[in-house]
Design a protein with these regions (language model features):
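Residue-level detection of beta-strand-connecting loop/turn positions
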Residues: 154, 235-237
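Short beta-strand edge segments in extracellular beta-sheet folds
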Residues: 246-250
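Conserved metal-binding segment of the jelly-roll/cupin
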Residues: 45, 51-52, 125, 183-195
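Short, surface-exposed secondary-structure boundary micro-motifs
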Residues: 15, 21, 193-194, 236
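Active-site pocket scaffolds in enzymes
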Residues: 187-228, 234, 241-243
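Active-site microenvironments in enzyme catalytic cores
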Residues: 1-160, 166-172, 212
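Hydrophobic alpha-helical bundle architecture
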Residues: 160-185, 196, 209-221
Length: 250
């Protein structure tokens, strides 16, 4: 089971701007004009959170299954109007996530201007969630300066740094979500896909690789995930354990 098998809320940001730019290019969409000033946030399902070894049941391969390697935090009680300068006391735990996404369902959903729903199935989380102080110097100003490694079908496809290029810190994300609401202890807040501009760092989701292939060769050549595929997500320092999942058929 996930550290929290159910949560009051699961809220995911998109704080790595390189990811936003690449994925929007992949669906021929422009980044918002407020990209650097106003965080992107969506609210996912929190009643069914997957554990680090739970298989992912793929009901329709044509939906375009993709993994997304992320860092997330668990909040304590967070008052409405909490500012970034006050948010450190709200962040209680840090862990990893695999924010599964069904890419082929995204364009039609977003075209309706009402956000993600069917394209965001249950999210998986690392075995362990640790207090920020356990990260030592790796926890700086609301960012986890850890290296997130994604291993797809036994091959390392990404070793991305989660700290320096996280444009909006977790504290800034807290300020954004608390603008009009308060949050109960146990709310989970995600960073979005960890992504670096340096292509040598690799990828934390297949959508980025497909976009890079399109930029370089005119079309994507990497398919989305299929039954039998595996994904392993872990961080250095390894405080959270590894998420290791296999895609299975319905």
């Amino acid at each position: 089971a996930a550290p929290l098998p159910r949560a009051f809320e699961w809220i995911d940001g998109s704080a790595f701007l390189n990811h936003v730019i690449l994925v929007r290019k992949a669906r021929n969409a422009e980044p918002p004009k407020t990209l650097e000033t106003d965080p992107l946030i969506y609210q996912g399902g929190s009643g069914d959170l997957l554990g680090c070894r739970d298989p992912f049941v793929l009901r329709e391969p044509a939906w375009g299954l993709d993994f997304e390697s992320e860092v997330c935090v668990v909040l304590g009680d967070t008052p409405i109007g909490t500012k970034a300068s006050e948010a450190a006391s709200c962040v209680k735990l840090v862990m990893l996530a695999n924010d599964w996404t069904l890419r082929a369902l995204v364009p039609d959903e977003l075209a309706k201007s009402f956000g993600f729903f069917n394209s965001k199935p249950a999210t998986a989380f690392s075995a362990f969630a640790v207090t920020p102080d356990e990260l030592g110097a790796a926890w700086q100003n609301g960012r986890a300066h850890v290296r997130v490694t994604s291993t797809y079908n036994g091959n390392v496809v990404g070793t991305c740094d989660a700290g320096p290029e996280m444009h909006f810190s977790f504290y800034e994300l807290v300020q954004h979500i608390a603008k009009t609401r308060r949050f109960a202890a146990g709310t989970i807040l995600g960073s979005g896909t960890v992504s670096n501009a340096d292509r040598a760092r690799g990828i934390s989701c297949l959508a980025e690789r497909r976009m890079i292939e399109t930029i370089e060769g005119g079309k994507p050549t990497t398919p989305f995930m299929k039954v039998g595929d595996t994904i392993r997500i872990e961080a250095t320092p390894n405080l959270f354990g590894a998420i290791e999942e296999q895609v299975v058929g319905a």
